[in-house]
């Protein structure tokens, strides 16, 4: 296939485009981006047919900061006939065999979502036709490729596939999380999504277990603390502002009225450090580096607020500097990952795991 289709948050197309251009160049794949502001997606069109398949396989989705989901796609299908939109789509997928799932989607914009009812109606007859053609298995198979049909306008769609081991498990790359009625703020969904995204389901029981000690810097009113408490952890909540009373009543939270940048934990056996402070991203990164160098935590999740321009460049520079600082201070065994999550706005979420080679214990 010739195109790589990348879903992103509307307004972040330039950042998504800058990132995929760099990553494709690293693999010596030539091409150019096609996108419009607030479309909610980016097209990377390769110069060589087949290069999109290579990108879809060799670029890890989780390594892309601003991409929620991606798939290798054919040329844009235009003016699909109202009487039969199924046949042209099936024909365009002639080279796809024995896929395990079909997703008929739209970009995450209000305009595109107006097509969602149509997409639902199309899914059943399209699924049946793809099964008859051999492009889709009779039963869903999570180990086989996923067929994507993304309508970007009425009668206009990109069609292609993603590989199941390098694809978001969620429709449109968006996890559907419920806001708990007793959570102090909607920011709680950011940490909930971060845990789901960065911690494999098979390891969550060990790495997010009850009884762990944690610290929340900039905790007020307690949106992130709520997620730690919900998982049975003990939390040192650091903020000059007030904490939600229902969290304090659990007996799991100790509130330190202090500046998060000056706080030193009285106990150093901290597994989780979390931080969502409205501050310059470089300053937050430096704080996380200091805690890591002091060995005060095992895993951290923190948000970096983004500038208005050159967001990909800024984040890349901060992450590269962080890796350099850690290594200069003798910390070579670490895992660093970053994602613009669905519940993030003008920010990205970073996960830092120290000494992953020793597993889930301090070492």
UniProtKB/Swiss-Prot annotation:
Q: What is its EC number?
A: 2.1.1.186
Subcellular location field: Cytoplasm
Which residues are annotated as active site?
305 (proton acceptor)
Q: Where does S-adenosyl-L-methionine bind?
A: 187, 220-223, 239, 259, 276
Stored NCBIfam families: PRK11760.1 (NF008734)
Summarize subunit and interaction data from the UniProt record for this chain.
Monomer.
The name of this protein is Ribosomal RNA large subunit methyltransferase M
Name the lineage: Bacteria, Pseudomonadati, Pseudomonadota, Gammaproteobacteria, Alteromonadales
């Amino acid at each position: 296939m010739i195109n790589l289709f990348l879903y992103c948050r509307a307004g972040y197309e330039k950042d998504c485009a800058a990132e995929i251009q760099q990553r494709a160049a690293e693999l010596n794949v030539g091409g150019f981006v096609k996108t419009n502001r607030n479309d909610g997606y980016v097209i990377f069109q390769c110069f060589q047919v087949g290069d999109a398949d290579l990108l879809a396989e060799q670029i890890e989705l989780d390594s892309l900061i601003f991409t929620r989901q991606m798939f290798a796609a054919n040329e844009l299908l235009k003016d699909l006939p109202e009487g039969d939109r199924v046949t042209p789509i099936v024909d365009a997928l002639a080279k796809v065999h024995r896929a395990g799932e079909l997703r008929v989607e739209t970009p995450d914009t209000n305009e595109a979502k107006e097509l969602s009812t149509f997409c639902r109606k199309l899914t059943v007859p399209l699924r049946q036709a793809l099964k008859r053609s051999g492009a889709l298995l009779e039963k869903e198979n999570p180990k086989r490729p996923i067929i994507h049909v993304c309508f970007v306008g009425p009668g206009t769609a990109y069609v292609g596939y993603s590989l199941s081991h390098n694809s978001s498990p969620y429709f449109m790359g968006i996890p559907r999380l419920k806001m708990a009625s007793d959570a102090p703020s909607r920011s709680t969904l950011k940490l909930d999504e971060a845990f789901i995204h960065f911690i494999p389901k098979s390891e969550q029981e060990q790495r997010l277990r009850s009884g762990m000690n944690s610290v929340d810097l900039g905790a007020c009113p307690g949106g992130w603390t709520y997620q730690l408490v919900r998982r049975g952890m003990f939390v040192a909540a650091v903020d000059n502002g007030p904490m939600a009373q229902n969290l304090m009543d659990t007996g799991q939270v100790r509130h330190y009225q202090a500046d998060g940048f000056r706080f030193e934990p009285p106990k150093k056996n901290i597994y989780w450090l979390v931080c969502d402070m409205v501050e310059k991203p470089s300053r937050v990164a430096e704080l996380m580096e200091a805690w890591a160098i002091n060995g005060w935590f095992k895993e951290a999740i923190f948000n970096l607020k983004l500038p208005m321009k050159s967001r990909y460049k800024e984040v890349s520079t901060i992450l590269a500097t962080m890796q350099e600082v850690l290594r200069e201070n003798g910390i070579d065994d670490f895992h660093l990952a970053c994602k613009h999550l669905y519940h993030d706005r003008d920010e990205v979420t970073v996960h830092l795991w120290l000494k992953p080679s020793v597993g889930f214990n301090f070492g």
